[in-house]
Structure formats: C-alpha cells, structure tokens
Amino acid sequence: MAEEKNEELQTEETEQTKEDGHGDSAEQEETENNSGTEVEEQEEPEVHPLEIELNELKDRLARVRADYENFRRRTKEEKEAQAKYRAQGFIEKLLPALDNFERALLVEPKHEEAKQLLQGMEMVYRQVEEALKQEGVEPIPTEGELFDPHLHQAVMQVSEEGYEPNQIVEELQKGYKLKDRVIRHSMVKVNQ
C-alpha cells in the first residue's frame, strides 16, 4: 500500500509538473503575444504634440523664407527696371519739342541769316539725338517695314502700287523706343 501511495504521489506530482509546465508555456505564450503587441506598438510610435507643433513651425518657416526670397527678387527686378527706364518720363515730355525741332528743320530758309540759324538748329538737333541715343532711345523704323501693332499706330490706310499689303507707306509722326520699351508708337499710313 505504501508503494501504491508513492505511485499516486508521483503521478500527482507528474501531473502537477505537466500542469505547471503547461501553465508555464501558457504564460510564455502570453508573454510572447504581449511582447509581439509591444513590438507592434513600438513600430507605430506615438507622435507627441510637441513634435507636431515643431513640424508645423518648420513648414511655416520654410514658407516665410520662400516668401522673403520672392519679395527680395521682385524688389531687385523693380529696382533694375526703375534704373533701366528712369529717363522715360523726361523723354516723353521732350518728344513734342523734338517733333517741333524736326518740323522747323523742314522749312526752306529764304535769307542767308535764316540758313545760318537753320544750320545751328541742325547741330543742336543732332546733339539732342545723340544724347537720347546714349540713354537708349532710338526711333522706331517705319517706311518700307511691315505694320506691327506693337510698334506702329495706323492712322490711315491707302491703296498704293509697289507696296505689299500691311506695308508702311509713310510715317506721319516718328515713334521712339527706350531700350526694349515703346515710349511712343509711330503714326503711319499703311497699304491695304
């Protein structure tokens, strides 16, 4: 009987060990499962509100920098354009006087004194033209050219032999450009 009790005790111990071992493996599995969840949770890090704010501030800073660079570029371009065309207002005011000079030079003098006066006016006119040329002002070419609405203003249309359609027949008032900008369009007669 003592042997039977020993066997029963051993059987119970073995069963308990199996249960304990089984229990251990369940705990191990649970621990493994929990650690797997923790790994998954670690893969998706929690974004801290301060990090979000930092990223937003970095984005705003980048936009402000870009805006500032655009502002600097625009300001520089405007200053360059101002310097390039600084004389435009003065030249626009000078053009009517230049037109009157040209008309005066077309008059045929009858007296010797008038001829000398005309020669002096021609010298002054050439000096004014040269000064304008040095500032980048040049007359717009017209006669024989094809009509260009960006450069010319058609005042009359005529039908003349020897001219192509849209070819300028006569210049009625001289036009001028300051560098690449038209100050005043040429007034012209255009062939139909």
UniProtKB/Swiss-Prot annotation:
Gene3D superfamilies attached here? 3.90.20.20, Head domain of nucleotide exchange factor GrpE (2.30.22.10)
Q: Where is this region: Disordered?
A: 1-59
Which GO molecular function terms does the record list?
adenyl-nucleotide exchange factor activity; protein homodimerization activity; protein-folding chaperone binding; unfolded protein binding
Query: Which Pfam families does this chain map to?
Result: GrpE (PF01025)
Q: Where is the composition biased (Acidic residues)?
A: 1-14, 26-44
Query: What Gene Ontology terms for biological process does this UniProt record contain?
Result: protein folding
**Keyword Cytoplasm appears in the UniProt entry:** yes
Comp. bias (Basic and acidic residues): 15-25, 45-59
Locations listed in the record: Cytoplasm
Q: PROSITE patterns from the entry?
A: GRPE
Per the record, its GO cellular-component terms are: cytoplasm
Q: Do you know which InterPro entries this protein is assigned to?
A: GrpE, GrpE_coiled_coil, GrpE_head
Alphabetically sorted, this entry's keywords are:
Chaperone, Cytoplasm, Stress response
Listed NCBIfam families? PRK14140.1
PANTHER family of this UniProt entry?
GRPE PROTEIN, GRPE PROTEIN HOMOLOG, MITOCHONDRIAL
Q: How does it assemble?
A: Homodimer.
| Similarity comment text for this entry | Belongs to the GrpE family.
The record describes the protein's role as: Participates actively in the response to hyperosmotic and heat shock by preventing the aggregation of stress-denatured proteins, in association with DnaK and GrpE. It is the nucleotide exchange factor for DnaK and may function as a thermosensor. Unfolded proteins bind initially to DnaJ; upon interaction with the DnaJ-bound protein, DnaK hydrolyzes its bound ATP, resulting in the formation of a stable complex. GrpE releases ADP from DnaK; ATP binding to DnaK triggers the release of the substrate protein, thus completing the reaction cycle.
Recorded protein name is Protein GrpE
**Organism name:** Shouchella clausii (strain KSM-K16)
